[in-house]
């Protein structure tokens, strides 16, 4: 699957909700006084910049495959401390690094566990690999996108995107126990957990808004030159999402399951 394109402004609409898993992930890193920290899939750099406060002696590098995201992240750059660059996690091969963070990015990387040996080899004793991925199993959003995109009306224009999108057993995301096993066999001490965040979202069609800057973007990008078709497609998506996540008087509940893994080299 090709790297998707993201909308930094849309992504930031739910900045607080997206920041919480990042904070929960990085809070479990216990590497003492790291000198080099890499944040893979750094997005607009808002959370990457906070790492400089936690680790004042470290050089922080944020990497993202989206040029739009890196352009947005540059405002958080601090000469000699925090920098950003366009890059692909699949091709990133460090020589040495103290802490590797990959928050909500590896779900887009097929067979990402094959990258772990190289990353672990780059870590010193007590160095850390910390990542978080949305758990696809039992989460209906991606299936709704794929099903509508593959329907007779949209198949010719969106069918290829729907086929390439990870799904069910074909999703790159593995069971949390598999991550523990793989990393333990590489000589890591692993802290892992699986949890669900229940977000209360406001506004009309907030679940579609949440994913408009990320998972829905490949589909809408393909229709961006046809405003009428784009509006029709979004209307179909919105209707399905309202059925799956019905609004309540206080807002719309979005239960979002996530897997967390923090592994330290022994």
Locate each region found by the language model.
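Core SAM-dependent methyltransferase catalytic element
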Residues: 259-266
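C-terminal helical/coil "lid" or tail adjacent to the Rossmann-like core of SAM-dependent
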Residues: 3-6, 18, 186, 190-248
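Conserved catalytic/acceptor-binding region of the Class I
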Residues: 113, 128-203, 226
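Class I SAM-dependent methyltransferase SAM/SAH-binding core
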Residues: 36-40, 44-92, 114
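Conserved class I S-adenosyl-L-methionine
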Residues: 1-38, 46-50, 69-72
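A short SAM/SAH-binding and catalytic strip from SAM-dependent methyltransferases
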Residues: 99-112, 135
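Helix-to-beta-strand junctions that scaffold the AdoMet/dcAdoMet cofactor pocket
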Residues: 109-110, 123-125
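A short acidic, Gly/Pro-enriched loop at the edge of an enzyme's catalytic core
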Residues: 90-100
